[in-house]
A protein has these predicted regions:
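Helix N-cap at the start of a conserved alpha-helix in ABC-type nucleotide-binding domains
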Residues: 104-106
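Q-loop/switch helix immediately C-terminal to the Walker
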Residues: 23, 28-44
């Protein structure tokens, strides 16, 4: 991160990177709020209940905030994990299959969120088996673990990738 080995980085520096895995990494017996509060504590981020509730509205989760995760659909669980994007101050997002399980409206919201983050100077590495229409994206298609094609509006150097 920022020209330093990840093992030599401070927690503060590691917080510049937010990783959203493809699997559900939520505690099933806890509520949406409880799961997000645990994560916020891990990254040492303070946020008011009002602000947290407001962020949950983006992905239409506010009405379910006190539901245990086990009672949510796959798509709702995915949106809980993706809500971390709204709560994080990270400058780099690594997203693994972020749109899997999402409905069309949620995909559009996530696409807007990604585009706004990129336009504000954030960097995103997104892996997907589906070709989503995200504007202003550099796309590298891999086949058998090798670069097959590169589609970009403006190609940057390999070291910048």
């Amino acid at each position: 991160i920022m020209n330093k080995n990840i093992e030599d980085c401070s927690d503060k520096m590691r917080n510049h990177v937010l990783y959203i895995p493809h699997e559900n990494c939520l505690k099933e017996n806890l509520t949406i709020i409880e799961n997000l509060r645990i994560w916020l504590n891990l990254i040492d981020k303070k946020i008011s209940n009002y602000n947290l509730n407001d962020k949950l509205k983006y992905f239409d989760l506010y009405d379910f905030k006190d539901f245990p995760i086990r009672n949510l659909s796959h798509g709702q669980k995915r949106k809980v994990i993706l809500s971390k994007l709204l709560l994080s101050d990270s400058s780099i997002w690594i997203l693994d299959e972020p749109m899997n399980g999402l409905d069309i409206d949620s995909i559009k919201k996530l696409s807007r969120l990604i585009e706004n983050f990129s336009e504000s100077g954030g960097a995103i590495l997104l892996s997907s088996h589906v070709n989503y229409k995200i504007k202003k994206a550099n796309k590298i298609h891999l086949k058998k673990r090798k670069i097959n094609t590169i589609r970009t509006q403006k190609f940057i150097t390999w070291s910048e990738l």
